[in-house]
């Protein structure tokens, strides 16, 4: 299968790419920098230069693919405005990726987070939160899933709140880096609260 992936050189994406290549799929990865393109090539995939704001590049990548996986996100959490910008950027990118797939029966896979369920462990049946700084991401996922009746094999994989690799990446990576820098490891879990963490 010919697969187009965004975020293919990121933490989760690099693990997904490795699985796709090992299974014999032909992969094209959106690459926003020279170093990202080099990492894509080293992983055995074809880089397609562009970013999530290059909507024509995204459409072209999706048009040529037999399936699309969207994993990229801006990850600028420096301010509410930056987060809002990243959420809007992702919504527009997903719309661009979805357009060429409508009516084709080809898959579009994206990711969603794990919601908080007060007093119990959450499940995949729990609704995604649409409130808060990244609530718009849940709305984007809902729009992707709503494409199923329009001939898109739409899916959203729910990732745990923390995805990490060797102490790098995600919230666990931030905590690990802080502990390495300061010599102090913090426990951010309130009494009785549980959370999921997993490697990619």
Model features per residue range: what roles?
Residues 3-25:
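N-terminal Rossmann NAD(P)H-binding glycine-rich loop of SDR-like oxidoreductase domains
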Residues 6, 66-71, 110-111:
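Rossmann-fold scaffold of SDR-type NAD(P)-dependent oxidoreductases
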Residues 26, 74, 80-81, 87-134, ...:
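Conserved Rossmann-fold NAD(P)-dependent oxidoreductase catalytic core, especially the SDR/UDP-sugar
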Residues 31-92:
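NAD(P)H-binding glycine-rich loop region in Rossmannoid oxidoreductase-like domains
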Residues 75, 113-117, 160-163, 182:
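Active-site segment of SDR-like NAD(P)-dependent oxidoreductases
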Residues 138, 164-174:
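Glycine/proline-rich active-site loop of Rossmann-fold NAD(P)-dependent oxidoreductases
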Residues 143-166:
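Conserved beta-loop-beta element that borders a ligand/cofactor-binding pocket
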Residues 177-198:
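A conserved pocket-lining segment of Rossmann-fold NAD(P)-dependent short-chain dehydrogenase/reductase
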């Amino acid at each position: 299968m010919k697969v187009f992936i965004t975020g293919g050189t990121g933490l989760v994406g690099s693990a997904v790419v490795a699985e796709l290549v090992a299974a014999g799929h032909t992969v094209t990865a959106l690459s926003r920098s020279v170093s990202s393109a080099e990492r894509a090539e080293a992983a055995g995939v074809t880089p397609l230069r562009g970013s999530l704001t290059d909507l024509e590049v995204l459409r072209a990548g999706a048009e040529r693919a037999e399936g699309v996986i969207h994993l990229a996100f801006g990850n600028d959490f420096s301010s509410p405005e930056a987060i809002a910008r990243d959420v809007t950027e992702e919504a527009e990118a997903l719309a661009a990726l979805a357009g060429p797939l409508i009516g084709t029966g080809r898959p579009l896979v994206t990711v969603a987070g794990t919601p908080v369920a007060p007093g119990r462990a959450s499940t995949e049946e729990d609704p995604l939160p649409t409130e808060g700084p990244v609530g718009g991401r849940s709305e984007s996922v809902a729009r992707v899933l709503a494409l199923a009746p329009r001939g898109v094999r739409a899916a959203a994989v729910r990732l745990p709140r923390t995805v990490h690799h060797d102490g790098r990446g995600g919230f666990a990576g931030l905590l690990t880096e802080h502990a390495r820098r300061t010599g102090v490891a913090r426990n951010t879990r309130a009494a009785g609260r549980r959370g999921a963490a997993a490697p990619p």
